[in-house]
Amino acid sequence: MKPFFVFKCFLTVLLLSSCKTKSLLPGPLLAGWNGKKVCEKIEDNKHQRILKCTFKPDEGHERHYHLPHFGYTLEGSTFKIKDTTGTRIVNVKTGSYFDNNGIEWHEVINIGDSTAVFLIIEPK
């Protein structure tokens, strides 16, 4: 009986150590704003997924997470961004870009007077 107990303990440790946590939040493609989609998939292949996200004034992106990605601003505006560090106002300029190793969660709203458009490039 003792070898079986040791095997059960080993199996339990192995299974627990291989568990990956997954966010309960939607990713950027599934997250929308007031029931409306704000991102569309424009490319999805074995190397990358590219999203185009459009935010009219007073539209935003409900709380969601991001995997590592690169972003490029096709059309900028001013955003109120809320995340794990708090809330801030950011003036996002056309042609600006950013990259990160993922975002646990954030939510944004376009508080500017112009439509903003972003490309989000997620490597696979």
Question: Model-derived features: where do they sit?
Answer:
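Positively charged n-region of N-terminal signal peptides that target proteins for export
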Residues: 1-5
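C-terminal motif of bacterial Sec signal peptides marking the signal peptidase cleavage site
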Residues: 15-18
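Bacterial lipoprotein signal-peptidase II cleavage site
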Residues: 20-26
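Post-signal peptide N-terminal segment of mature Sec-exported envelope proteins
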Residues: 28-46
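Conserved short histidine dyad/triad with adjacent acidic residue
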Residues: 49-65, 82
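Glycine- and acidic-residue-biased ligand/ion/polar-headgroup-sensing regions
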Residues: 66-85
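Ligand-binding loop in jelly-roll beta-barrel domains
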Residues: 76, 103-124
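Short acidic-glycine-tyrosine-enriched beta hairpin
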Residues: 86-103
